[in-house]
Amino acid sequence: MTQNVGFCAYTDDFTFFMDGGVESWAKSPESVIECINAAAEEVSSLEPDFILFQEVDFDSTRSYHIDEQEILRAAFPQMAEVDAVNYHSAFLMYPLTQPHGSSNSSMVTFSSVGITGALRRSLPISTGFSKFLDLDRCYTISRVPTENGKELVLFNVHLSAYGGSDEIRAAQMNMLFGDMLAEYQKGNYVVCGGDFNHDFTGNSTQVLNGGEMTDFGWAQPFPAEMLPEGLTRCDNYTDGKVEP
């Protein structure tokens, strides 16, 4: 199970300033707590063995310094956990009407069985202004032993949205796919989930916007042609269809 909780700001009426919207902070502290609890409840209802969260804030201006990590830990107390900070900004004085402020955000992986090792891998990012909203992009690699001596290797990823030249996107994909392929070639089981910041299915902007195609600029088509042999993607979550 994977979910980007969006620093627990995205109520139905929230519009983020970097997507052409208005707000740079969540609506209120109460709204943040309500959103993180709702996310935890929804995920818990599905009883997943593995959970991959992105944009989990702690001590951030935009989410009123609420520790969303601690709330998730309390919701899944029996699960093993791996955290990695992938967004740290001392203070962003933009937008001027409501500065984004200081930000700390992480990716959190939960597992119902023990994790024997984990690694954080830094991704290449833009060097322009957008890097101030795209700091420390990374993915985590978590290792879970199996009965046959192989490992289940979980990749929790959050790729760039706003940085995004074609070169940066390609470099991030090549790095991720290279690490996944290396594990697959060792005979390990490999699962990758997270926020790719791409149009993963080919019609995701339409599905998520009431049937209307919407151009977000950053939601480029997922480069399925870059997938190495042996790796597949699931692009239809209803019937479990897997497309090579």
Task: Report each predicted region and the residues it spans.
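N-terminal, active-site-proximal structural segment of metallo-dependent hydrolase catalytic domains
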Residues: 1-78, 83-104
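Active-site beta-strand/loop signature of hydrolases that rely on acidic residues for catalysis
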Residues: 2-5, 38-65, 110, 142-144, ...
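Solvent-exposed loop/turn segments at secondary-structure junctions
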Residues: 5-8, 57-60, 86-90, 115-116, ...
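Surface-exposed cleft-lining segments at the edges of enzyme active sites
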Residues: 22-29, 56-58, 123-131, 158-169
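A SAM-dependent methyltransferase catalytic signature shared across enzymes that methylate proteins
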Residues: 73-82, 111-119, 221-236
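Conserved beta strand-loop-helix elements of the APE1-like EEP
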Residues: 74-77, 101-118, 145, 243-244
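Metal-dependent phosphoesterases centered on the DNase I-like endonuclease/exonuclease/phosphatase
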Residues: 163-244
